[in-house]
């Protein structure tokens, strides 16, 4: 596709208007695919390919030629620099469900970008599926609530549900109002483990029958 780009920072806010003073409606993660709707000075209006979400991000840090082969399976993965054959941690991370390309690897580390390495145990093949939903949701225990957030630095309730599906390469809407329309309604008496439950302004997951 001609208008087909991939985000190349660990994450950034998606704003409703081209200013950091406007509302944050969501975030975009490393390796996430999007198209550019328009450009405005230092900003671009984008539409994410996964869920058709629109908003503004800064006009930097994206690429065209990118074929993700793996994804981050840890809540956040420490980034390392390789100096004289030693791996030195730096104060940067890449977050759960981010898509990456494997450039080089050794027994314990993989290089996903030039001179940026992460631990091999922190990634899975891009086609890996985690059927145990509770395993993913437990990763985010004690994560603070953040409107528009999509990572362990802060996440909102609808993003928490969506991130499970995104990790598993399955579609699910970003916002609660759209999630309600997308889901099949069931009786309260029929709640089972794994059911998605909506109430005023929020969404959650049923852990037990």
Where are these regions (language model features)?
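Generic N-terminal amphipathic/basic segments
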Residues: 1-12
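Short, structured beta-strand/loop micro-motifs enriched in basic residues and often containing a Trp
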Residues: 10-19, 73-86, 175-185
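A structural connector/turn signal
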Residues: 23, 89, 185-189
